[in-house]
Each structure stands twice: as C-alpha cells, then as structure tokens.
Amino acid sequence: MIDRLRQQVSVCELCNLHKTRVNPVFDKGNSNAILMICGMVPAHDENMQGVPFVGRAGKLLDKILVAAGLTYDDVYITNLVKCFVAAGQSLEKHWVESCRPYLTKQINIIKPHVIITLGADSSRSLCDLAGNMPMKNMRGRILHYSRNTMIVPTYHPSYLLRKGGVKSEQYIEVLEDFNLAKKCLKEMIKMATYT
C-alpha cells in the first residue's frame, strides 16, 4: 500500500511545485513503526536525493534521535509537503491542501500511535490549529489527532540550527518533547494491551 502511494506522489501534479522539483520526497525509516515524525517541506538536499532529512537539519535530527534513544528502525519520517520549496519561500496553503490527502493516507497506512510534528506549520496542519499560535505554546503537550493517534508538537531542526543547534535552549526542549512522545507511546501500548 505504501509503495502504491509513493508511486502516486512521484507523478503528482496537483500544484505548481511539481514543476520545480527534481524528486518528490516521500518517506524514510520503518513503515511498520508506531512512531511517526512529520516535518514541513523538503529542502534542497532532500529535493536532490528524494529522501527527507538528509541535509543539515537531517544531521541534527539524527543527533536528536540518538539522544532520545531512537533509531530509524523505530520511526517513520515524512513531510507535510512532498515537493521542494525554496529557502525563504513562504508555505502556501494550497500546497499543503494538495498534499494533505497523501499525508492522511500515509497516516492511515502506517497507523502510528504517536506523531511528532516538527515545526509550527506541520503542527498547526495536523492538529487543525488556526491562527498563529507560536511553537513555544504548542510544544510540551500531547494533542489528539484521532482516537488511536496522538500528536506531540516540537521545534523543527532547521529552527534549532538558527538558534545554535545542540547548544540552544530549544534543543533541550526538543529532547523533552521526544521523551514525552516516547512516554505517550508506552502509555498507548499499555492501554492497547488492556482493551
């Protein structure tokens, strides 16, 4: 099922981003994972390789995963938007809406218990949060996506890079959020065994 969806994304022309992409960026990690990570948009390196989180932000995400005691076998990684958006370009609502059915299908196929959303845009989109609530007010909480899936919003690694990377205050907060996601995951697994 996930391979069929990946193929659909590879030929997608629902918005104008397909004209400037080199490769659509679909996923990375374990498609059987119960922990999903959802970023925002592919950057240049991701566009070139067709894989999410392979650039500088990806290298920082690697460090975050290690610090949180996770590997790529533990997580499934995707983005809100599947095609390259140039640095500094504002995320347009119709791009998100064009990709939303793909992300929804990914979530329905993977069936994660917890989704860690990286960045304000992916957090707002998946949590249906309106307005401009800052990430500092979203993070550190568990939000409901569906009956069987929770969301833990946190900062995007690219934001951390602008704030000083692993030396930033926000890096510690991201680790707290990843640990919150792991704790939530354990609770959901425990609840599932009793139902």
Segments (PLM) and residue ranges:
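A polyanion-binding, active-site-adjacent surface
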Residues: 1-195
